[in-house]
């Protein structure tokens, strides 16, 4: 379902001190933007921000870059992030929110940024053959991620889509990533530390199992 236009979103984002209007300016120097040397985690397709809001407010010693493309969804993410921090009485200084085409992620990140972990949660499965190269786990995307992932950097990938998950296993192999952990039913796996996204809650209520893996960058 297409999200309705939200005229308030762009002005509210531009007045937000953790929204980055021109992320290309920080390429290669994101630690400087955070003003510390803490590890950086990257969420690709942050949606309404529920996931990064919980993660960031619970882990003040980790920096988070959260990316999506539409102002409408980023505006909601901004509000959800602020709400999570306010409820926990936490200072919001470890999240940077921005609009960026993920297919061009190397415009804003490079090897100097040394990203420790990437989260890909319930991305578009692009089931048609001619569209599969758009998948966030496709080999050509993984090659981009390798440029800025640190040595032994991780990708945490969750999806409800069986075909996407199975084909992504081959993508990771082609992209020289080792599968460190895999489950076809995350919620009965005993894996600790999972934070549910809004999509994950919806699919779980429908009885759809969440597939999950952790892939490690290899030399």
Curated annotation (Swiss-Prot):
Substrate binds at residues 128, 160. The keyword Protease does not apply. Gene3D superfamilies: Vaccinia Virus protein VP39 (3.40.50.150). This is tRNA (guanine-N(7)-)-methyltransferase. Catalyzes the formation of N(7)-methylguanine at position 46 (m7G46) in tRNA. It is an enzyme of class 2 (transferase). It comes from the Bacteria. Coiled coil: none annotated. S-adenosyl-L-methionine binds at residues 43, 68, 101, 124. GO terms for cellular component: tRNA methyltransferase complex. Pathway: tRNA modification; N(7)-methylguanine-tRNA biosynthesis. InterPro entries: SAM-dependent_MTases_sf, tRNA_(Gua-N-7)_MeTrfase_Trmb, tRNA_methyltr_TrmB_bact. Keywords: Methyltransferase, S-adenosyl-L-methionine, Transferase, tRNA processing. It comes from Clostridium botulinum (strain Eklund 17B / Type B).
């Amino acid at each position: 379902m297409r999200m309705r236009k939200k005229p308030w979103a762009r002005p509210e984002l531009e007045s937000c001190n953790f929204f980055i209007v021109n992320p290309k300016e920080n390429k290669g120097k994101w630690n400087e933007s955070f003003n510390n040397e803490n590890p950086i985690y990257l969420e690709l397709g942050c949606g309404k921000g529920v996931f990064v809001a919980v993660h960031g407010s619970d882990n003040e010693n980790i920096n988070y870059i959260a990316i999506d493309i539409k102002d409408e969804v980023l505006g909601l993410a901004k509000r959800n992030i602020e709400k999570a921090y306010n409820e926990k009485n936490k200072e919001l200084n470890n999240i940077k929110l921005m609009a960026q085409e993920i297919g061009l992620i190397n415009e804003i990140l490079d090897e100097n940024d040394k990203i420790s972990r990437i989260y890909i949660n319930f991305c578009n499965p692009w089931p048609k053959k001619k569209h599969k190269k758009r998948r966030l786990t496709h080999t050509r995307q993984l090659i981009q991620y390798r440029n800025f992932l640190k040595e032994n950097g991780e990708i945490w990938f969750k999806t409800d889509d069986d075909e996407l998950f199975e084909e992504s296993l081959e993508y990771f192999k082609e992209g020289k990533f080792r599968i460190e952990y895999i489950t076809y039913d995350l919620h009965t796996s005993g894996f600790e530390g999972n934070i549910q996204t809004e999509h994950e809650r919806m699919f779980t209520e429908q009885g759809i199992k969440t597939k999950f893996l952790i892939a490690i960058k290899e030399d």
